[in-house]
Amino acid sequence: MTLTQEKRSYMEKLSDENGIISALAFDQRGALKRLMAQYQTQEPTIAQMEELKVLVAEELTPYASSMLLDPEYGLPAAKHLDKNAGLLLAYEKTGYDTTSTKRLPDCLVEWSAKRLKKQGADAVKFLLYYDVDGDEEVNQQKQAYIERIGSECKAEDIPFFLEILAYDETITDAASVEYAKVKPHKVLDAMKVFSDERFGIDVLKVEVPVNMKYVEGFGDGPIVHTQDQAANFFKQQDQATPLPYIYLSAGVSAKLFQDTLVFAKESGANFNGVLCGRATWAGSVKDYIEKGEAAARQWLRTEGFKNIDELNKVLKATATSWKER
């Protein structure tokens, strides 16, 4: 990969001394509200969301190479990162329009790459829903949108992390067997599209190419892929892009995510780290809502630390430096 000196220095800040990105993701907004709402009757407040993000930043960034936050509720937390941790800021609005299958991208209207950089970001992250087999007119809109963000990041000389969430316009349940069958094609082909230089992307944040719950030996439901088939998809994923790529945890358990990383490595995926969110911190939400700040801190110092420490050990054994791509 070719990086300007400025972008390279930001990438160094976001990764550890071995060039591995062990980033903590807490840019959840809608998903966080829904999690909190499970444990209280009233609507979660802005103050609650901001405070929990601060707690997670204070307690867990000493063990992460960087943290991803949103500029809506995450700016207080951005001031509480460990001194060695880098900062990624999300540029997209949360969620998507559920009345349509288009899932068009949308920036936070009062933000720009320039403003995110001024706020202290070491990288701009943008989430895109993409169906490679979807409406061509819609996909051209999405590609043009990403080109614009790439140009912004190039102008500001700041790394651009594109998070791709693949989907199928005709399948409503992403957890279904039906979608599991087409997921490898959806994930891999979307990666190929956005590896084109014209998008100006520096790192791809991607899903693993299969739903591990339907892989032989990993789940207790129906089997969609044998382990050999799944391994082949991981190998294909590594060949799908010349760019550094990191895995998102997609809300799965810490254990399944760690097992998946080991499987990925054994299959020949030379991934460059993770942006791991709920698998690390989700358990703190219940304690925070029901018992308060001290209980949430205690959970983060014990269970949260255990999650991130185990993940770091797995990463050390499985991930490779982004400098090698």
Swiss-Prot record:
It is an enzyme of class 4 (lyase). It catalyses: D-tagatofuranose 1,6-bisphosphate = D-glyceraldehyde 3-phosphate + dihydroxyacetone phosphate. SUPFAM superfamilies: Aldolase. Pathway: Carbohydrate metabolism; D-tagatose 6-phosphate degradation; D-glyceraldehyde 3-phosphate and glycerone phosphate from D-tagatose 6-phosphate: step 2/2. Keywords: Lactose metabolism, Lyase. The keyword Iron-sulfur does not apply. The keyword rRNA-binding does not apply. Its EC number is 4.1.2.40. Transmembrane segments: none annotated. InterPro entries: Aldolase_TIM (IPR013785), DeoC/FbaB/LacD_aldolase (IPR002915), LacD_aldolase (IPR050552), Tag_1.6-dipho_adolase (IPR005927). One of its GO terms (molecular function) is tagatose-6-phosphate kinase activity. Gene3D superfamilies: Aldolase class I (3.20.20.70). Belongs to the aldolase LacD family. This is Tagatose 1,6-diphosphate aldolase 1. The lineage of its organism: Bacteria, Bacillati, Bacillota, Bacilli, Lactobacillales. The gene is lacD1.
